[in-house]
Amino acid sequence: MKDFITEAWLRANHTLSEGAEIHLPADSRLTPSARELLESRHLRIKFIDEQGRLFVDDEQQQPQPVHGLTSSDEHPQACCELCRQPVAKKPDTLTHLSAEKMVAKSDPRLGFRAVLDSTIALAVWLQIELAEPWQPWLADIRSRLGNIMRADALGEPLGCQAIVGLSDEDLHRLSHQPLRYLDHDHLVPEASHGRDAALLNLLRTKVRETETVAAQVFITRSFEVLRPDILQALNRLSSTVYVMMILSVTKQPLTVKQIQQRLGETQ
């Protein structure tokens, strides 16, 4: 008999930030209230089995295998971007830019994907290295980075997504006025700040590097911005990690709820 996942279990085990993706055991099913909660938060639901295969429910709520990044169950024929011809056998010098298009591995867009991939890897490592208070933050950061990768791969707009309930505007305000909202002024990283701040600073600088590479790819020579959504998302992620660094060095770090209260009081 399949286990049912309840609304209470979801709230206890996931941040449920709007626009994120969650993976649930393949042998589980959602109670009506749990499904309603996920749909209200616009979450993508995937089920994962013991072999790591991912599934989504079809209209009859039957599991259908899908690609981990694109959520697609189709395998279209890929064509070379240069010659527009189908690629029957992929050479080592070409790779997928999308499911339908292959490009040379020297393509700057692949350079952006590679740096983004490294940033995701570092975020996952910090999920292992850092203590429980940072886990909701890091889970949402990892999710946001994955959604950036997905939006770029599919050529789709990047939707809004809060980090631990904090909006892009909230994070912008916090990172620009930390003394006002977080009880600690701006900081320049140093060893005395401790291990957490040092590890978070690695992630912050990696996100900034990803943002600058994205700018090289998505801002044309005539200053046309091709993906303002991706550039803003990376900028706000850098702000997010900076806020985490400041919280890590304060003597009595505020909770997310306390931060939200302060933000609300000054609106």
From Swiss-Prot:
A single GO CC term, please? bacterial microcompartment
Q: Which UniProt keywords apply?
A: ATP-binding, Bacterial microcompartment, Metal-binding, Nucleotide-binding, Transferase
Q: What is its main location?
A: other
Q: Where does a divalent metal cation bind?
A: 80, 83
Localization per Swiss-Prot or TrEMBL: Bacterial microcompartment
Q: How does the cofactor attach, per the note?
A: Binds 1 divalent metal cation ion per homodimer with both subunits providing Cys ligands; Fe(2+) gives most activity and is possibly the physiological cofactor.
The UniProt entry, under SUPFAM superfamilies, shows: Cobalamin adenosyltransferase-like
- Enzyme Commission code(s) on record: 2.5.1.154
Q: Does the keyword Membrane apply?
A: no
Q: What class of enzyme is it?
A: transferase
Role played:
Converts cyanocobalamin (CN-B12) to adenosylcobalamin (AdoCbl), the inducer of the eut operon. Is not active on cobinamide nor other intermediates in the adenosylcobalamin synthetic pathway. Allows full induction of the eut operon.
Q: What is this protein identified as?
A: Corrinoid adenosyltransferase EutT
Organism this protein belongs to: Escherichia coli (strain K12)
Q: Gene name on record?
A: eutT
